[in-house]
Design a protein with these regions (language model features):
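Short amphipathic alpha-helical segments
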Residues: 14-41, 78-80
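An amphipathic, aromatic/His-enriched active-site/gating alpha helix that lines ligand/cofactor pockets
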Residues: 33-37, 52, 60-96
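Coil-to-beta-strand transition motifs
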Residues: 1-3, 34
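Short, well-ordered beta-strand segments in beta-rich or mixed alpha/beta enzyme
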Residues: 3-9, 41-72
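Short, low-complexity intrinsically disordered segments
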Residues: 10, 16-19, 65, 84
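Short hydrophobic/aromatic patches at helix-to-coil boundaries
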Residues: 97-101
Length: 101
């Protein structure tokens, strides 16, 4: 299994709207691609929140092929939708992890 992790620092001014959008729109749209089996949204603790809270969105793929299919076929459009909606009020970095145990 593979976990696609997106860590996001968001501006305080969008926190409530962004959380609602993630839960009701964005994460369901990612799952609807059929590339991931499940998702979860986490809030990081013990981090500097001066500029805003930090979250991690995690998506679990059964195999590398499913993850690669998402990156090739779906990620560019979904990322653009995020930028179109929120502009520069968030920053994100991505990582991929393989479950070993």
């Amino acid at each position: 299994m593979f976990i696609y992790n997106i860590t996001l620092k968001i501006d305080w001014s969008i926190e409530n709207d962004w959380l609602q959008w993630m839960k009701e729109e964005h994460m369901p749209e990612v799952l609807a691609t059929g590339c991931f089996e499940k998702s979860q949204l986490l809030r990081l603790i013990e981090v500097d929140e001066t500029d805003g809270p930090t979250f991690a969105a995690q998506y679990t793929a059964a195999n590398r092929e499913a993850y690669d299919r998402f990156i090739s076929n779906h990620a560019p459009d979904l990322r653009q939708k995020s930028f179109d909606k929120w502009g520069n009020r968030f920053v994100a970095f991505r990582s991929v992890m393989e479950v070993v145990h």
